[in-house]
Structures are given as C-alpha cells and as structure tokens.
A protein has these predicted regions:
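Regulatory and interdomain segments flanking nucleotide-handling catalytic cores
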Residues: 1-2, 6, 14-332
Length: 332
C-alpha cells in the first residue's frame, strides 16, 4: 500500500525509527535492517578522514584503491545515456551540482507516473533507477569512500529486504520490531541468505563448433543465443522464487550469482529447477551443454566479511559446490 511504501522511505534509518509509533510487523523494520546491511557492506572509511557531508562529492572509481592504488579518479555528472557514450572516470575536477540532482528527481518522478505498483513493473523500476542513480555516490560523508553508487546501494537493500521477508515468513516470525530492530545484532548472526550460482559448461565447444562458411556470423549468433538463454534461465528462476532482478548480483559468460533467502522452499525450487534445465539441455543439445548450480549459506555479517575471511570463504564454498557438480554431471 501507499502508506507501507511511505513508511519504508521515511523510516529506513534507525534514528527516525526509534521513536516512531508503528506496528510491530511494519515493513519499514525490514527496510531499515536491509539498509544497514547494505551500508556496512558497501561503506568503508577513507584513509584521510574529514568531518561532515558534502553533496557535491562525485562518484569515485572503484579502481582508486584496488591493489593498493592511491588513485583520484571520479565520474562526471551523467545519467545513463547511450547517445553520450561511456562515462569514463577522469581526474579532472568534478562537482555534483544541484541542477543535476533536480533533473534526476524529475526524471524518476515522471517515470513513476507511468509505472503501476504491480509485480511485473518491479524490473522496470530497477531500470529507471539504474539510468538515474548509477553515477551518484551512495554516501557523501567526507569520512567514507564514495565509490559505491546510490543505484547499487538501493539494489542491494532491495535484494536483502526481499530475502529477509521470506526467511522470517517461513519461520512465522512476524514481530519485525523485536527481531530486526531491538535484537538486530543477534539477527546479524543468523543464516538468512544463500549465495546461489549457476554456471553453464561446454560453452567454448558449443560456440566454436561451427562450419567454416559464415563462421564469424555463426560465432556471434551462438554467443548471443547463450547470453539470451542464460538471462531467460535467471528470470525464470527469480520468478519461481518470487524475487526480482534486484537479487541478481552478476551475470556474464554463462555464469551468474544471485542472493536468495535461505528457506526450505527456495532450496526445493532451485533443486527441481536445476534438474528441469539439465533435462531440457539433454533433450536439445545432448551432453554438449550442462548447467551446474550451487550455493553457500551466509549471514548478514558474512556480507561485511565478519569474521575476517568469511566473505572469501563464502565464494570458495560456492565454487567447490559447482566443481563437484561438474565432476559428477549425471547420476544413474
């Protein structure tokens, strides 16, 4: 409802939620909890700390501190627009101006008027937000690095919130205030998430087994086919588990990562879905293509690498599960 959405916007920070007179199952408790997880996953303190906030701060390049670098590149004020080309980071002075923020707000407002608050429009909303928020920093604090976009922060918040809601629903835990606000620290230790991955094997052989005549066109066609097929597989799975593309972390090269809720229902659905996809691949491509699926259980603290090394261990666990599936493709 409109009131639920307004509550999620108004009270997504704990300082505003603390004194609010709200029902114990108000969805804003989930939003606040998810926003905190997204924040401690993407916000890190800068080496040179200054006090206060500065709304003129541009989005920095993630490569500034990669591998010990000390770069100073950032992005120009720009919405995603194919006509303007790629917005490469620059070391030239850049300040986020007020008129740019007004343009962004107006474009989002205009697009919201044409979007219904229904399931099929969720991904359309994500597209609108991506176009407008990709080059806006999620934090303008002088004490923090500003290399994570507001779009990525909002997307992660939505992904986490949808997982938390399903996780609590399966456990019949409806007192969100107690679980996610009053006892948030202990809930950070609960295995709420699944880092889920799918990986298609046989891609190289499939793409390059084309006749010499028209080889280039054939290579492009097969590569495009695999890309579209993978996106379709992702969308179908997300629909079956009642999630959106906000939960898609990465997709490319026949591989993807998704953030899913750690529920028995999701595990049942993903297991059946993997079997169905591989049966379809066998029927259409014999044993040429195969999809391996695996996951690792994660807590909110895992997403901020606490304890140290747990974030890397999560991805290693997923990789080991995929390797095991590929080594034992078919069972009698």
């Amino acid at each position: 409802t409109d009131s639920e959405i307004l509550h999620c916007v108004k009270y997504h920070h704990g300082k505003y939620l603390a004194g609010a007179d709200l029902k114990e199952n108000d969805l804003c408790y989930i939003t606040c909890f998810a926003d905190n997880i997204a924040a401690f996953a993407d916000r890190r303190e800068a080496d040179l700390q200054e006090a206060g906030f500065d709304k003129r701060i541009p989005l920095d390049s993630v490569f500034n501190i990669l591998n010990g670098n000390q770069g100073n590149s950032h992005y120009a004020m720009q919405r995603l627009n194919p006509a303007m080309g790629i917005n490469y980071p620059t070391e030239e002075p850049v300040e986020m101006e007020e008129h740019f923020y007004r343009t962004v707000v107006q474009d989002i407002t205009d697009n919201l008027r044409g979007i219904s608050l229904e399931e099929e429009y969720v991904n359309s909303l994500l597209t609108v937000l991506e176009a407008n928020l990709t080059y806006i920093p999620s934090s303008t604090s002088r004490k923090e690095l500003s290399d994570i976009s507001l779009y990525d922060h909002v997307k992660i918040t939505a992904a986490v919130a949808s997982c938390v809601e399903q996780y609590l629903e399966e456990r019949n835990q409806n007192n969100y205030r107690e679980k996610l606000f009053e006892n948030a620290v202990s809930t950070y230790e609960e295995p709420i998430f699944l880092l889920y991955s799918m990986d298609i094997s046989g891609i190289q052989k499939f793409i390059y087994s084309v006749a010499e005549a028209g080889a280039l066109k054939g290579l492009r066609a097969r590569s495009f086919y695999l890309e579209i097929m993978m996106e379709h597989i992702i969308d179908e799975l997300l629909e079956q588990v009642s999630l959106s593309r906000a939960n898609l972390i990465y997709s490319g090269g026949g591989h993807c990562y998704l953030l899913l809720p750690n529920t028995d229902e999701v595990k049942r659905i993903t297991e059946a879905y993997e079997a169905d996809i591989n049966e379809w691949l066998r029927q259409n491509f014999d044993i040429e293509l195969y999809i391996a699926c695996g996951y690792a259980v994660a807590t909110p603290n895992t997403l901020r690498n606490e304890p140290r090394g747990s974030y890397e261990e999560m991805y290693l666990t997923v990789s080991e599960n995929l390797s095991g599936k590929k080594a034992h493709r078919y069972q009698a």
